[in-house]
Amino acid sequence: IYLLKKYLKTKIPSVNKKNITDLIDVVLEDLEKTKFINDKFYSNSKAKSLIHRGASINKIRNYLLTKGVKDKYIEETINQIKENNEDQDFFSAIKICKKKRIGPTRDENNRPLFYKKDLGILARSGFSFETSKKILDLNKEEYIKIISLL
């Protein structure tokens, strides 16, 4: 939208702002009618992508809100995620631990030293305290079993 405004201003300097915004509205309506712009599809596909990267449900919800997706579509997407996997946050937190080498992936001698730091990393990633604590309390054998299932 910004680029379209800039393009129209440079090519046609006599156009006023009202005409530009009207033109943009017409283009957006046309794209929505032809289903090139679809919030529901965007919400579902972006959520799948974020889950694959290990994002928490809270992080997915906040990301979609910042992108301007309607609350109705966000709730549908979140409910669909919860139906597919009841404890999605747990598995996403495991992926974060594997990627950042924290929690159960650390050496047993260093785990107590880094417990608070690891808890903070998981909290900033959007995981609840209970989920983070459950992940950090796993021993190495349980962690390896869970990773083999993913």
Regions found by a protein language model. Give the residues of each.
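An alpha-helical, amphipathic repeat domain used for nucleic-acid recognition
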Residues: 1-150
